[in-house]
């Protein structure tokens, strides 16, 4: 993110909010075999997450049932994933995604990278707490058992949520930049550890200075240097950390573009990013997407999704007329 730039989401608290009325309308929409999906979209995508939690509590009081459980029963496929995802508080949603990325055979390393490289100390702490409450498991222990090597070491460092905050030292930045340059040249295990320690623990303002010093020393952007020197998930994680520090909305725009175009519309990634960033910086992500790729996110979603699933994603994006 450009220094000092204002970022904006696409979903805001609804004015004149009435949780009892919303709960009643959802109760009607979810009755019978043919639920009113348009009503679900109109309500759940036009309320903030805090308002949705109030609706869920009111729904429970009125009908004696958990709203998420009812949505899971009544809906199916990707539309269900969107509606259910909207109902989780943000830390619980991150925990849910991480759990499903690691449970069962195989691990979704890209999900681990996307979430842990982009979250703040506070977000990671809350996510760890939610993970423990929801699954009676320790997030750090699960990551340790499901990953390996320097990739695991870096994830374990991130999940500690020990990044310094609001501190910068120009003299130390020059030293750190030299360490990063040496790590890209020598590529020993010790140098890999030193690199991930700097990228995972230094504050964002400090790393801005480090990246500038690295450019001065090497004549190369750090992302390009990492791509030249390393490979595999360790390389992808380091690049994600750097890109999130440089410009987080651009990182998510890039992830969305790849999810839509490189993987035949990777639904889980698209859904996860749109929901997770909807109240933080999704409008800014849309702007970056259009600037970098020439077509709007709204346009590309319309080309690849369909039906109520498409309508729900577009409602979260809050597209304008000119985006069609």
UniProtKB/Swiss-Prot annotation:
Keyword ATP-binding: no
SUPFAM superfamilies documented for this protein: Annexin
One MF annotation (Gene Ontology) recorded for this entry: calcium-dependent phospholipid binding
Cellular component GO terms, alphabetical: mitochondrion
Annexin repeats: 17-88, 89-160, 171-243, 247-318
Protein origin, superkingdom: Eukaryota
Alphabetic keyword roster: Annexin, Repeat
InterPro entries on file: Annexin, Annexin_repeat, Annexin_repeat_CS, Annexin_sf, ANX10
Any Pfam family matching the protein: Annexin
The family this protein is said to belong to: Belongs to the annexin family.
Protein name: Annexin A10
Annotated organism of origin: Mus musculus
The encoding gene: Anxa10
């Amino acid at each position: 993110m450009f220094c000092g730039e204002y970022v904006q989401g696409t979903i805001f608290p609804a004015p004149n909010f009435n949780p009892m009325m919303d709960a009643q309308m959802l109760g009607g929409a979810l009755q019978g075999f043919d639920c009113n999906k348009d009503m679900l979209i109109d309500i759940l995508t036009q309320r903030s997450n805090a308002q949705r939690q109030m609706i869920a509590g009111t729904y429970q009081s009125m009908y004696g049932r958990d709203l998420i459980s009812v949505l899971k029963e009544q809906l199916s496929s990707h539309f269900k994933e969107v509606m259910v995802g909207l109902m989780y508080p943000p830390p619980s949603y991150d925990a849910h995604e991480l759990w499903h990325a690691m449970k069962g055979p195989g691990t979704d390393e890209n999900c681990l990278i996307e979430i842990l490289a982009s979250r703040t100390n506070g977000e990671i702490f809350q996510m760890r707490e939610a993970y423990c409450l929801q699954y009676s498991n320790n997030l750090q222990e699960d990551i340790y058992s499901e990953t390996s090597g320097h990739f695991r070491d870096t994830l374990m460092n991130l999940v500690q949520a020990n990044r310094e905050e609001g501190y910068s030292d120009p003299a130390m930045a020059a030293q750190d930049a030299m360490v990063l340059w040496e790590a890209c040249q020598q590529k020993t295990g010790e140098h890999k550890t030193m690199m991930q320690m700097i990228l995972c623990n230094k504050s964002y303002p400090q790393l801005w200075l480090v990246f500038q010093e690295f450019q001065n020393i090497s004549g190369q952007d750090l992302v390009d240097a990492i791509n030249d020197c390393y490979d595999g998930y360790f390389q992808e994680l380091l690049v994600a950390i750097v890109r999130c520090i440089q410009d987080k909305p651009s990182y998510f725009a890039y992830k969305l573009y790849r999810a839509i175009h490189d993987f035949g519309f990777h639904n889980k990634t698209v859904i996860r990013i749109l929901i997770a960033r909807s109240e933080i910086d999704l409008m800014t992500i849309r702007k970056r997407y259009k600037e970098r790729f020439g077509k709007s996110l709204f346009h590309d979603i319309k080309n690849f999704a369909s039906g109520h699933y498409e309508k729900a994603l577009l409602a979260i994006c809050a597209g304008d007329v000119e985006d069609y």
